[in-house]
């Protein structure tokens, strides 16, 4: 079974269950290098209830996004959480991630809310190696899986990060 089929199967299983009380936790982070713009676009997809639970455990703050009544500085806490749990190095150099925007969508299958975080890294002319450390939600959920899809140098790579292995490196030759 190839990775794409496995991801689709896992997504169907997850999305067809009650996500407020589930045993399997998933996030998807996509990194896409745009050579023309010299940027690395980053999109993170998280279930809002899981993100809110993690932020509550870490900061003691209830964001209220799940209940459609977000607190005034909810986006600040989301940014802070992402910056403290997602780290990238390109060509063996740590890079600065810039937060662009946050979107909330409801999934059609289960009507659960998903948060999309758009970020970017500027001035990336070429990528010979990339290191990703993704600790999103790992401290809150033992079965958390963080799928990272990387599109760089015409190659698509997929990482499956979890509590045991939260960091991986890819070298392009």
What are these regions (language model features)?
Residues 22-173:
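N-terminal soluble domains immediately following signal/targeting peptides that reside
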Residues 4-15:
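Sec-dependent N-terminal signal peptides
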Residues 17-21:
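Sec/Tat signal peptide C-region and signal peptidase I cleavage site
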């Amino acid at each position: 079974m190839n990775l794409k089929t496995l991801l689709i199967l896992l997504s169907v299983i997850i999305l067809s269950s009650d996500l407020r009380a589930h045993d399997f936790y998933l996030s998807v982070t996509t990194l896409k290098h745009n050579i023309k713009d010299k940027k690395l676009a980053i999109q993170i997809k998280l279930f809002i209830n899981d993100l809110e639970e993690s932020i509550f455990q870490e900061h003691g703050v209830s964001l209220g996004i799940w209940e459609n009544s977000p607190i005034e500085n909810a986006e600040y806490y989301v940014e802070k959480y992402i910056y403290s749990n997602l780290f990238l190095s390109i060509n063996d150099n740590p890079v600065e991630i810039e937060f662009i925007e946050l979107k909330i969508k409801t999934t059609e299958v289960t009507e659960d809310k998903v948060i999309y975080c758009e970020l970017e890294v500027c001035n990336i002319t070429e990528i010979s190696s990339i290191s990703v450390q993704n600790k999103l939600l790992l401290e809150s959920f033992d079965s958390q899986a963080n799928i990272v899809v990387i599109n760089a140098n015409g190659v698509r790579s997929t990482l499956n990060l979890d509590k045991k292995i939260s960091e991986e490196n890819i070298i392009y030759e």
